[in-house]
Amino acid sequence: MKITVIGAGNVGATAALRIAEKQLAKEVVLIDIVEGIPQGKALDMYESGAVALFDTTVLGSNDYKDSADSDIVLITAGLARKPGMSREDLLKINATIIRDVTTEVMKYSANPIIIMVSNPLDVMTFVAWKASGLPKERVIGMAGVLDTARYKNFIAEALDVSMQDISAMVLGGHGDSMVPIVNYTNVAGIPLTELLPQDKIDALVERTRNGGIEIVNYLKTGSAFYAPAASAVEMIEGITKDRKRIIPCTTLLEGQYGIESVFCGVPVKLGKNGVEQILEINLTASELEALRKSAALVEENCKNLATLLG
């Protein structure tokens, strides 16, 4: 198993290290355009193997040739969001970057599974899919895993319970329009609605929607990376170990939930072939409406890129 991580910034480097420590691949390649950065970080990671007890090889490079024959490619490249900058502000800049990165990746790997982390997430997943020519099930966006993790964290904090006992799901686009599904949220099987009043639940939902910007506002010059990296690696682990995990991911919908030809976060079965099944769960009328509105925003942004993508 060979996994390539594109982008040696905070998310990419953290993800590469987690992949190595979990020994999810025989070889991890970290690629970045800045000379010396991927090489230095990769060497540092590799040298930690004797202490962290992993045998995974970690290579840093500026050359996409070193990504040849990758089974999985994690794309984290792009401009990071700054205070006052919406994900949509990043649209044009990152679309160009992702298109070029994906084109380079496909020169050397015939049939990889691509996992997208770069923002705006849903649109960048679309860009990678168009640029790669890969089947839709092999180009996946990391959104719902991260958003759900934040949602679970806030619930656990509010109730003073273990996060391990919380079952929850956040669907829709990765942004202000995301849709935490309260109807399917429970703590050890107990519905959240029986544990918290509606106003508290509404506050948790709102904080989840603003989870990324909350961190951006603290950091000032950067954005979240520990939780995004952990979320991406959870997806990678589900694929490499063929675990058939049911988790929310960004995938191309073709009629599911009444949404056509749009990348949107929904529950999927994740295995060795990528997205192996899209699950259509019963949503309330308001949840379904919110999901469709979220998808419509993604669709609008994708249409704005039509000229760029040709």
Curated annotation (Swiss-Prot):
E.C. number(s) listed in UniProt: 1.1.1.37
Amino-acid positions noted as binding NAD(+) in the UniProt annotation, renumbered to this chain: 7-12, 32, 94, 117-119
GO MF terms, alphabetically ordered: L-lactate dehydrogenase activity; L-malate dehydrogenase (NAD+) activity
Gene3D superfamilies, per database record: Lactate dehydrogenase/glycoside hydrolase, family 4, C-terminal, NAD(P)-binding Rossmann-like Domain
Source species, domain of life: Bacteria
Reactions catalysed according to its record: (S)-malate + NAD(+) = oxaloacetate + NADH + H(+)
Binding site for substrate: 81, 87, 119, 150
Residues forming the catalytic site: 174 (proton acceptor)
Annotated HAMAP family: Malate_dehydrog_3
Identification of the protein by name: Malate dehydrogenase
Annotated organism of origin: Pelodictyon phaeoclathratiforme (strain DSM 5477 / BU-1)
